[in-house]
């Protein structure tokens, strides 16, 4: 069974932030030591990183659930909790990251390129960081935020310069084995190649990568044979090489009809995926000319192919005849394609910033004096609040009021006793709104309490 896997679905969870600490400094002869609770550590991110030594997504198919490390809670004496370690997942060069609905998130190309796919939760503030002139010794701390949960799909599109296309048993694997150090499985029956094979070829000063993909047959676009699923591996190829079998004895088969059939399947693939392969330079290798009848057939069809605009070379993977000329011809095409490319950008870290001018929150009337507040800040603040602590709840009320939610609710038509939903859509926190609370007053009372909630 092959170990090559080019698709995988991952279920990822970033680390949760550590909770802040509630602590009061206690020392002999210092009765008013003040708050000294440390902050919680941040949760670890989940990061995808291109690694040139990784060639398959097999490990992620076997273990699709991954989780980064949580942040540690804060401690007394102003000791912050340790941040959780990032979880770095190596992926092959050419991995495309999409949502489960098919929306492309990133195309990871180039060794060392990184993508943060799930951000760790921020650590909660300890009571030392929450102290203010109005609240000198807070009796509460903020909880750490949960890390992001994401489900993504990884799809590998091999990075190669030349893609070999043709019928099964046309000799593609033998050709790549003869031209490079690759050692694919070779046998005299169709569909021996079940996974893409890569080989590095040197032609003078030019070095390039050749990809041998499983063979195509008429009707591959309808699911016959191995279908078209492996054609994604030639999408990035700058040059395509038709490998045509001149020694086949199958009825209805000849190099011209084989080439036309493969071109039809390439066109169907382009229509389905939106990837136009028609503009890629094509060369034709008439293979197996070590067989006398095959050489005669190659001499017969070569002028027909040249008339169609193809550059044609007669080769034999078995005797290596014509392979040097083929390697240099492909090298010329690859060098020309590389010269036409824009200069490579340095390895980059891919971020997903929020839109500029993002609205901090929005009040949505649901009817019957029920309202929903959505927005990043209110949702995050609710997650950070310890609702078993009245002082923490009062602090949340102050923050929401300073953000302008009280005024927005009034403008939306909310009246006293309105039901207000804030937080995650599937599990919001429900408040009974009391517009008479004056959150600007000085809050005094025992730690952990709020006079407004008594």
UniProtKB/Swiss-Prot annotation:
Domain OBG-type G, first and last residues per copy: 160-335
Stretches for region Disordered: 60-87
Cleaved signal peptide residues: none
Domain of life: Bacteria
Binding site for Mg(2+): 173, 193
GO molecular function, one term: magnesium ion binding
Record's subcellular location: Cytoplasm
Keyword Hydrolase: yes
Keywords: Cytoplasm, GTP-binding, Hydrolase, Magnesium, Metal-binding, Nucleotide-binding
Alphabetical list of Pfam families matching this protein: DUF1967 (PF09269), GTP1_OBG (PF01018), MMR_HSR1 (PF01926)
GO cellular component entries: cytoplasm
InterPro entries registered for this protein in UniProt: G_OBG, GTP-bd, GTP-bd_Obg/CgtA, GTP-bd_prot_GTP1/OBG_C_sf, GTP1-OBG_CS, GTP1_OBG_dom, GTP1_OBG_dom_sf, OBG_GTPase
GO terms (BP aspect): ribosome biogenesis
Cofactor: Mg(2+)
Class of enzymatic activity (EC top level): hydrolase
Residues annotated as binding GTP: 166-173, 191-195, 212-215, 287-290, 316-318
Domain Obg: 2-159
Segments forming domain OCT: 353-435
EC number(s) per entry: 3.6.5.-
Quaternary data: Monomer.
Similarity annotation: Belongs to the TRAFAC class OBG-HflX-like GTPase superfamily. OBG GTPase family.
Role description: An essential GTPase which binds GTP, GDP and possibly (p)ppGpp with moderate affinity, with high nucleotide exchange rates and a fairly low GTP hydrolysis rate. Plays a role in control of the cell cycle, stress response, ribosome biogenesis and in those bacteria that undergo differentiation, in morphogenesis control.
The protein, known as: GTPase Obg
Species: Thermobifida fusca (strain YX)
């Amino acid at each position: 069974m092959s170990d090559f896997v080019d698709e995988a679905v991952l279920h990822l969870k970033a680390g949760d932030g550590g909770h802040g600490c509630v602590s009061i400094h206690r020392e002999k002869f210092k009765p008013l030591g003040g708050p000294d609770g440390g902050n919680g550590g941040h949760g670890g991110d989940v990061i995808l990183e291109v690694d040139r030594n990784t060639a398959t997504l097999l490990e992620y198919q076997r273990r699709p659930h991954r989780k980064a490390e949580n942040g540690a809670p804060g401690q007394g004496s102003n000791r912050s909790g340790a941040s959780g370690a990032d979880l770095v997942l190596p992926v092959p060069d050419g991995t495309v990251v999409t949502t489960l609905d098919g929306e492309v998130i990133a195309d990871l190309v180039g060794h060392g390129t990184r993508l943060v796919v799930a951000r760790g939760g921020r650590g909660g503030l300890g009571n030392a960081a929450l102290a203010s002139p109005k609240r000198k010794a807070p009796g509460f701390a903020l909880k750490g935020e949960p890390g992001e949960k994401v489900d993504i799909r990884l799809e590998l599109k091999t990075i190669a310069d030349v893609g070999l296309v043709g019928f099964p048993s046309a000799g593609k694997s033998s050709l790549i084995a003869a031209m490079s150090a690759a050692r694919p499985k070779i046998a005299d029956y169709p569909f021996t190649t079940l996974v893409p094979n890569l080989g590095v070829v040197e032609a003078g000063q030019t070095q390039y990568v050749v990809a041998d993909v499983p063979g195509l047959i008429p009707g591959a676009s309808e699911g016959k044979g191995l279908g078209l699923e492996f054609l994604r591996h030639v999408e990035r190829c700058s040059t395509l090489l038709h490998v045509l079998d001149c020694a086949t004895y199958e009825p209805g088969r000849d190099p011209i009809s084989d080439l036309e059939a493969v071109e039809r399947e390439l066109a169907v693939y382009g229509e389905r995926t939106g990837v136009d392969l028609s503009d890629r330079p094509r060369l034709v290798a008439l293979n197996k000319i070590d067989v006398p009848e095959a050489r005669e057939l190659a001499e017969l069809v070569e002028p027909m192919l040249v008339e169609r605009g193809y550059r044609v070379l007669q080769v034999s993977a078995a005797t290596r005849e014509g392979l040097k000329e083929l390697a240099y011809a492909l090298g010329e095409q690859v060098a020309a394609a590389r010269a036409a490319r824009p200069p490579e950008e340095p390895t980059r870290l891919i971020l997903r910033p929020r839109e500029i001018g993002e609205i901090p929150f929005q009040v949505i009337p649901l009817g019957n004096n029920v309202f929903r507040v959505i927005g990043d800040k209110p949702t995050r603040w609710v997650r950070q609040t310890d609702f078993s602590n009245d002082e923490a709840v009062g602090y949340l009320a102050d923050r929401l009021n300073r953000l302008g939610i009280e005024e927005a609710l009034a403008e939306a038509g909310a009246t006293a006793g309105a039901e207000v939903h804030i937080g995650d859509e599937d599990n919001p926190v429900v408040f009974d709104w009391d517009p008479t609370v004056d959150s600007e007053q000085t809050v005094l009372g025992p730690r952990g309490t709020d006079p407004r909630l008594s």
